[in-house]
Amino acid sequence: MADITDIKSIIYTEKSLGLQEEGYVVIQTSEKMTKNQLKAVLKEYFGVTPVKINSLRMKGKTKRFRGVEGKRDNYKKFYVKLPEGASIESLAV
């Protein structure tokens, strides 16, 4: 079962702030989290049942540091449509 610790952060970009006006929140999670698990976590910890959830798998970027090549972790990005009047205030993990 997924836990709130699988949620890495809420993403704040120009696109996500524009979607916020339409009632969406963009959440970055670990790669293993599913839509149903995210729905359960949001319901348990924030008391919000999402109307709609869309997900994307994002590949981690390749980075170089002092000549050594490494890779950031892959992650999932969820676009969560919240009911009218509902919000997720903070995500202090």
Curated annotation (Swiss-Prot):
The keyword Ribonucleoprotein applies. One of its GO terms (cellular component) is ribonucleoprotein complex. GO terms for biological process: translation. Gene3D superfamilies: 3.30.70.330. The keyword Cytoplasm does not apply. It comes from the Bacteria. One of the early assembly proteins it binds 23S rRNA. One of the proteins that surrounds the polypeptide exit tunnel on the outside of the ribosome. Forms the main docking site for trigger factor binding to the ribosome. Part of the 50S ribosomal subunit. Contacts protein L29, and trigger factor when it is bound to the ribosome. This is Large ribosomal subunit protein uL23.
